[in-house]
Amino acid sequence: MTPQELLAELLLKNEKEGRRMLQTDIHIFDGPSLALLVELIKREADRQWNNNAQVSFMLAGYILAIGDLTNNKAYHALGLMARGDALRRMDRDQDSLPFFDASGEEFKEVGDEVGWARTRIGRISACLQLNRTSEALRDATAAREVFMRHGKLLRAGQIDVNAAIVNYELGQYDQALRLFDRAIETYSLQGEGVELNIARALGNKAITLAPQGKFREAVALHEQARGTFAAYGGQEVAVAREELNIAQIFASQGHYSQALLLFSRSRTIFLQHNLQFQAAEVAQQICLCLVRLNRAREAFELAGETVTFFRSSSGHRHNLAYSLMYQAEAATLEGNYGDADVMLQEASIILEEGGFMALASIVRLQQAELYFAGGQLEDSQREAQHVADAFAEQEALPQLARTALLQARIAASTGDINTAQYLCDHALDIAQGQGLLDLKYRCDYLLGQIAERRSDLEAAARYYDRAVQGIDEVQNHLVLDERTSFLEDKGNIYQRAIILALKRDNKDQALIYVEKAKSRVIGDYLRNNIDIRLRAGDKAGEAILEDLVKLREEQAWYSSIVYEAENEANLSDTAIMRIRAIAPEQARKEMQLRERRIEHLLEQMQLRLAGDLVARQRSSWTNSIVTTLWPKLEQDTTMLEYYIAEQDLYIFQLTRKGIDVHIVQDAVPQLERLHSLWRVNLDLAARTAGTQDQAQSFVGLEDNSLGLLQKLYDLLLRPVSHVLDNCEHLIVVPYGILHYLPFHCLFDGTQFVVERLDVSYLPAAALWEICRQRGERIETKKARLSDSLVLGISDNGRLQFAVQEAEVVAKQLGARPMLDNAATASLLWQFGARSPIVHIAAHGLFRLDAPNFSHIKLADRQLSTIEVFNLDLSCCSLVTLSACETGRAVVGGVDEVIGLGRGFLYAGAASLLPTLWKVDDASSAELMEMFYQALLGEYSKTAALAGAQRAFLTRARTSSRPYRVHPYFWAAFHLIGDPGPLL
């Protein structure tokens, strides 16, 4: 039996069986063969560190057994060291120290000075994890001297790297850099075969450069190290570590999407190699990105998971402190100042006890920011001053800039404008020099406020403009919903810029800022043709798609239980059995769990698809998007764009003559009250419709609705009625709560607005040109109306007129209606790309809690917002969603509209006809027949809708059911996007 064969046999045994085999077979090996066997076992034990530390532990036991069986103390010492290394890899650092110490003593006894020095390598790492840094540095000095004396250059370099890491953790960056450089120099003296060692040292040196703000140099070193590891092969974990480090720098600079992409990639590799500890460290870094993107709840929960993980691990106390810091930051963002303070106090104690003063300073900076958020200015100033001195001494420039900005905010809050200016300029200088995007715009914003307080409006306007541009720069590096969440707390910056521009009578500039805050995500993606549709193309992408399909099926199943339980009387026996299989409360939890997983996977896919686009600079949002808009409007067209600041309403009026603005002071409280009453009226109308006494009940409801709609008209349109006198087409660009109001059925005291004007809507004025060009492009294609896709589902008889509506519309278009079981979502993927019209009459559900999962119920699945994004509707002139609340949305960011409509616009549709509330299916069917009749009669889309609504009103007023004049029956439909001709 050869040593190689014995090792192969040992790997198949448990430790007890392996020891018996050694007792039986060890005598057959002579001295050289025995030495080879020990070397092979030790090499395999080292190889198993990252794969299976338990196997490494067992192999160390075999070396110990060989030492005992042969009375060879050197082998026994080697076994002790190997066992210590295995324990360290099992996160049992405290348990590993006695083995390293015993091993060192035995090596000394046999006169092996180098062997003793080798035991210090693992011991230093264990001491670092146990916060015994003085011991670690003492061991490093002694061991290096031994290695150099014996010409063991690789070992000497390794010791220097370990000592440098200890100094880095202590915040002694200059000493750490000197040691890394010495290690690299020592490796180079060795000659060949040191590339991987040098790469590791370069990567660690880069980590030390980052806290000093030397980001470009650090990234270059990480890239160099990553290239070396990738070239050698079999270094997946090492490559992942370098990507993790690059991601940390990207996060510091405000490139959050790039950071999240690399974090996700490295975390996946760590988990694949069962490196739970390293995966938890990556999760910590992800928390930081989530906080910066205002995703506080996600960050808090993820940080909580890492807190639990590191509490259960022996040692690693500074990692626990990191987790507490990130969780505290998320708690602060949510306004839970008390919880955040408790977390920071625990983190501070851990770090100060361990001597991690650099990290302890960051905790104190967080405490200073927490005090400032809570209005404790004196406490905040005290802590900030302390850490400012510490960061200056450490040359930790990013943290120093962050501290200076906080001190500037404190000074500004206490009226010390000169000090605030000085400190903020200092912070901005550092931020600009280091490329700290997130810090730059915040400095410019504060400088704008300072200039405004000094009545230097020109300087204030300049600073505010730079702040807005800074936000744009960060957004350019984000994908989809990350942009929306990032903007959540930026409204005040836009507001100050807008109000100051108006104060300086710069109406164009004010409108530019309003537009920059509105529906930027969909607008930017459409302008830049960024394709984030899910598609197979690589193994990783296909795996994500498979997971998404499975999760989406499960989410839809639980969703059907949650939202159909209320209508059990109308369900099939199968549906009732499904609902009774699990309680709706538990089903809701399961549904929400899968929705979070789906959104996470979608984000990963979007990062993969758009990653290279967010990494490079693109053409940014330009002011000409607004300034060239109004001259292109038709002579008879007026665009009204609304904005809300504090309690005031701003109405921007765009006509071919130019831009004007009217301010309605103290309008917001009235708007909120009237909107609430309007929703109550609609809800009552929905309950009353179809009842036996509906004719009598609607008398009061109609009078009430007219009163509410007239008051809304007085606030929203009467102040600018003079521009409507010569107008035929009104384009409304709402803001905030106004997205939920039907401007076309506001009442002027005599008639509804739609009775004298054609009305269409846009989420943002900047989308007007995009939608108009789409309409013109589709018009030139001369598509056949018979290729239109018309779907109708009665939903087990609950929507009696949906199928009838689809049949009538299909007949008008010369298309084949797809009804009930034939009305599947798969048809949209199969035929949507060549359909000039997509008409869906079905049940819709708006999800206020999760707008990305608002959906239309089709025969084979729920067609949700996230799936609509993946459709190709590039030849579609009009999408009609004749279903409940398909036009409702959640307003996120500053004014980002999130709902089904956004998905259809992204998919390529030129215009959209959704509903603002739960509709009466009989009235909808009647209105749709009138609409398509007008549309096919050469009317534009907006004129056809207005004509249909006028015809409906005329018919209702002269019929036996005059109560149908109530807007509930006819006004839910509104046109979004291109108002022009169909084809």
Task: Cite the ranges covered by each PLM segment.
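Internal alpha-solenoid helical repeat scaffolds
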Residues: R20, G31-A45, N52-P211, E217-R241
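Amphipathic alpha-helical protein-protein interaction segments
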Residues: P3, Y441, L457-V754, K781-L789
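Repeat-mediated protein-protein interaction surfaces in helical alpha-solenoids
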Residues: K13-P32, M58-I66, I471-L480
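Tandem amphipathic alpha-helical repeat scaffolds
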Residues: P3, L7, V38-N51, A77-R92, ...
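N-terminal alpha-helical interaction modules that lie
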Residues: M1-Q54, K516, R520
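Amphipathic alpha-helical segments of tetratricopeptide repeats
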Residues: L64-D68, G104-G111, T141-K152, D181-G191, ...
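Catalytic cores of enzymes
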Residues: R616-L983
